Amino acid sequence: MNKIQDELELVLPTPEYKTQVEEYLQEFFDNGEYEIAGDGGLDRIKNFEEWLLKVQKDLSEESIEDNRIPATLYLTVRKSDNRVVGNLQIRHKLNEKLLQYGGHIGDSVRPSERRKGYASWMLNN
């Protein structure tokens, strides 16, 4: 197993990650970045509990908001310090907009953790 594989894991968001997710979001804003790819709307909603509920609803076509498509969002967490270093969203099908501009996968890595191979790892796992 490579070093990055040993360092990281993909996890579904849960209430236990509230502080880590809020710090993750704030780092983007502090870096002047106000749009986060594949974040399930975190950059717009900004409230963890509301965002978590939306992410959970997004899992199923029966509970998703109108004009949305089912998607699974994962947090990329570094095991050694439980730090959220990225996010990965897998969209289970595409609508017209996503066919043109988004695709099946959206991902981001927090600014201070870039250029470490984390995005490549997320896409390969």
Residue ranges and their predicted role:
Residues 106-109, 115-125:
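Conserved acetyl-CoA-binding loop-helix of GNAT-fold acetyltransferases
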Residues 1-104, 111:
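GNAT-family acyltransferases
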